[in-house]
Structures are given as structure tokens and as C-alpha cells.
């Protein structure tokens, strides 16, 4: 069950004109968020920024693929905002990748919808920076966990 209290509202008022920013927030527990919630609030309502609370919009995990592809197509920049959980993206964000970034649309034959777009990661961890060092708790520098995003 996902925390539905204190969920931010999506900003889907159509202010994401071609060349805008599409910020996708995927935090399953907003009440516990110290950073993601504030970052989402700061971006919400800014001109040219469309925001999506992924868990708030799709609590049943039934993603509207066509609507999401249209939002991505309208954006010049896609920002993924979420905590790192078990050294990876939260489950609903992964499902979003699998269902929205499809063969023939995002990649493969004629899959050029992402061409010319930028992707920024705005990810947070529950541990301090020094825990992401060789010999420390997480054993690796944080960048070692980023190749799956780079390949996507």
C-alpha cells in the first residue's frame, strides 16, 4: 500500500509547450520524504514545467501509456525525481520505463521519440555521501549505480 496522504498534486494544465520540462516524481512514501517532496513542490507551478506524481496518478499501477508518451514528446527535458531504493529506481518508475519507453517509439526501428531530448536524474539516498565510498557501507561510489539509467 502506498502512502496517499500529503501527496502533491500533478501540474498537468498543459503548460508544457514543446521544449518544456517534464518532471516525473516517483516516491511511494511522501510523508517520509525529506527532500523529494520539497523539490517537487519547488518545481510545481513553474512556467514551462509539467509535473507528475507517479504514485499519486497511478496508484493502481495502470499507466496511461499514450498520455505519458505525449507528455514526453512535448518536453525537451525529462527529469526523474525519486529516492534510490535497493540501489535502483522505485518499482512504479521501472514499470513506467517498461510501458512508456517502448520499442518502435523510444528505440528500435523508427523509435526516435527521445532523439534530441535530455534526461536529468534528481535522485536521493537515505544514506550520507561518505557511505558511498569503497570500503564503506555501500561499498561503491554512487556513480557505480547509474549505468542502468545511462543505458535507458
What are these regions, as identified by a protein language model?
Residues 34-38, 63, 91-95:
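Generic recognition of short, well-ordered alpha-helical segments
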Residues 2-3, 7, 152:
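C-terminal and late-domain segments of enzyme folds
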Residues 2, 16-49:
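N-terminal beta1-alpha1 ligand-phosphate binding loop
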Residues 22-24, 50-52, 79, 120-122:
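Hydrophobic/aromatic beta-strand patches that form the interior of the parallel beta-sheet core
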Residues 28-30, 56-59, 139:
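Short histidine/acidic/glycine/proline-rich micro-motifs that form metal-
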Residues 48-62:
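A short beta-strand-loop structural module common to alpha/beta enzyme folds
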Residues 66-150:
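Helix-loop-strand module that forms the ligand-binding subsite of alpha/beta enzymes
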Residues 14-15, 113:
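Short, flexible hinge/linker loops that cap or flank conserved catalytic cores
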Amino acid at each position: 500500500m502506498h502512502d496517499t496522504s500529503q501527496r502533491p498534486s500533478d501540474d498537468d494544465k498543459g503548460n508544457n509547450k514543446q521544449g518544456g520540462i517534464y518532471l516525473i516524481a516517483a516516491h511511494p512514501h511522501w510523508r517520509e520524504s525529506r527532500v523529494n517532496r520539497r523539490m517537487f513542490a519547488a518545481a510545481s507551478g513553474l512556467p514551462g514545467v509539467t509535473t507528475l506524481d507517479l504514485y499519486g496518478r497511478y496508484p493502481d499501477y495502470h499507466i496511461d501509456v499514450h498520455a505519458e508518451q505525449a507528455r514526453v514528446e512535448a518536453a525537451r527535458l525529462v527529469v526523474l525525481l525519486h529516492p534510490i531504493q535497493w540501489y535502483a529506481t522505485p518499482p512504479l518508475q521501472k514499470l513506467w520505463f517498461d510501458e512508456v519507453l517502448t520499442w518502435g517509439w523510444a528505440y528500435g526501428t523508427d523509435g526516435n521519440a527521445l532523439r534530441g531530448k535530455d534526461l536529468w536524474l534528481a535522485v536521493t539516498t537515505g544514506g550520507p555521501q561518505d557511505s558511498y565510498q569503497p570500503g564503506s557501507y555501500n561499498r561503491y561510489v554512487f556513480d557505480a549505480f547509474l549505468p542502468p539509467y545511462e543505458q535507458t
